[in-house]
């Protein structure tokens, strides 16, 4: 379904652009947290540590221990730890979608190749420094970094999931 239609006017031509957004605005996917939220960084370009970079997801501040749930049905396709980036993280794959949940407390609630359902408890928000002394990725504090990828392309999570009211 075509969700947006924009016309951009240049000095010498008109360019029409249709932006395709899958029809998933009917709550096929859910927000991964079931409590109040505070968005600290949106998808797109941002300045962090004095440098401009592209942020591939949505950062939402929460207290350490806040539960994180699967946004969709799917399969656990990756579980890992990245000291310089995501910290503890889990990827759930569903059709051509991948949902990444990062800076988690641990990854023990699910195993690789597990089938999960929308609302399945995946983990909880982890601290900046994990109990083993390792940094929980590139983080300035406790938060969930949440990504949506479609056909392995980074997409704005807010195009697919409505924020809780």
Language-model segments: residues:
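N-terminal secretion targeting segments of exported proteins
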Residues: 1-28, 165
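A generic structural motif
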Residues: 43, 64, 80, 105-108, ...
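Short, solvent-exposed loop/turn segments at secondary-structure boundaries
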Residues: 51-52, 104, 136
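Active-site region of chymotrypsin-like
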Residues: 58, 92-111
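A short, sequence-level motif marking secondary-structure junctions
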Residues: 75, 102-109, 159-165
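Conserved, short, structured surface segments that act as functional micro-motifs
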Residues: 88-91, 114-165
